[in-house]
Amino acid sequence: MTQFNPVSQPAGGQASFIAVDWGTTNLRAFLMNQDGHIQAQRDSDRGMLKLGAAEFEHVLSDLLGDWLTPDLPIYMAGMVGSRGGWQEVPYLHCPIHLDDLSEHLFWLTTSLPNKVAIVPGLRSTGVAGLLDVMRGEETQLLGALDWLEEQDRAAESPIFCLPGTHCKWVQIKQGEVTQFSTSITGELFARLNDESSLVKGLPKSDQLNEAAFQKGVLASQQAGGILHHLFSARSRFVCGELMADDVRDYLSGVVIGHDVSDVLSSLERPTVPVLIIGSEALSARYALALSSLNLTSEFLAANEASIRGLKRLASRQVKSAVYPAIGA
């Protein structure tokens, strides 16, 4: 797995806008300069799930403090625009060019001196023809495309993988999102790893047991389906094929292995590296699963992708010099 260098570093210069990544559990704000680099960062644990509808503005105001000035527009991405967030913002229908997100920002009515916008999520169909949605990942995808353009790779059409609680697999052609599919991979593994009989009484570790993980990935590629393969964690342990400290990473390999192979079996085989956007640790697991299928991958940190995406949205607003009406 090739790892990209960070796309933004702490920098000086004149502040230009504020980028906000507001997820279910955390809130991060970045003061950005005119070149799109970070001047300062402020973090909070006041994610969407911890707030009532009337609390969002107050929480943001407290966090930003002296950043609250009329000449610094605020661009927010993530679950802040979901049902249960600050304001539910309608999904945009795919196919859609990611640069067109800047034309569909939802401008909030607030008592803050800054203009405040939420980036809309996307709605499409997955590989099974079923409805699918994303919110927050669209901004990361825009950031990834911006990076590819900077590297003179705009003509490439990689498959994008955004692992997490719900993993997104995205197809983009010439900057246009054509289709994406969501897997409940992370949430499923969390339940199995915390509550299931498969791991009861077994040790936990923060370190990846790569050999055990690879065994799980290989099991996922056999006949029988995921339900059968999951139980094999128990049977292989009690029969001595797995050690106690193998089981959790074996389960992770089964779940991630199925995510990778099940989705990719419905798509054309990638001819360029799969672009993984996420945390380094989780992305490394996906890279291992991809390599078992003789596929290469590249890694871009989710935080870096979000910042770059919001920077691109902000720059397009400045170029157009037009801010839509509030509440639109």
List PLM regions with ranges.
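Short glycine-rich, Thr/Ser-proximal phosphate-binding strand/loop in the N-terminal lobe
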Residues: 16-55
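Short glycine-aspartate micro-motif
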Residues: 17-21, 73-75, 158-162, 275
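Short beta-strand-loop/turn "lid" adjacent to the catalytic site in phosphate-handling enzymes
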Residues: 67-131, 174
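Glycine-rich phosphate-binding/hydrolytic loop that grips phosphoryl groups
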Residues: 298-328
